[in-house]
């Protein structure tokens, strides 16, 4: 009798842990929407600050994270509700289109424009009048460097350098 109970208990433990690990996996994949958005913004700030070598690795992080996020949403691994809870609204409103790469292009464009606007067209989150938009290249560079530093962009880059999930062959 004991020998029968042990395998049954083991099976029950395994079966009960599957939904939890699936939910954890879905949560991690849902968070990739934010990683993608942030990486694309950081790539833009790196570019604007004259740090061109940081642009490509951050772009790749955004591309890989975004692709995994979109594929998880499309396959149903991540529900629409979970995606809306974990990913920025700017990402979740752009999830309609013919292909994953099309959606990634839309997200990249939107994140880049948002990052640019935060440097050139906004002050403390408030949109400036067009006459007050910044056009001084050095000031733009300085503000972009500050955003890059304050936006934890180096942490995304370090993840790539340390061999994290987003490590690319070109690094």
Task: State what each model feature region is.
Residues 67-171:
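Compact alpha-helical subdomains of small soluble proteins
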Residues 23-54:
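Immediate post-signal-peptide N-terminus of mature secreted/exported proteins
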Residues 47-81:
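N-terminal, post-signal-peptide region of Sec/Tat-exported proteins
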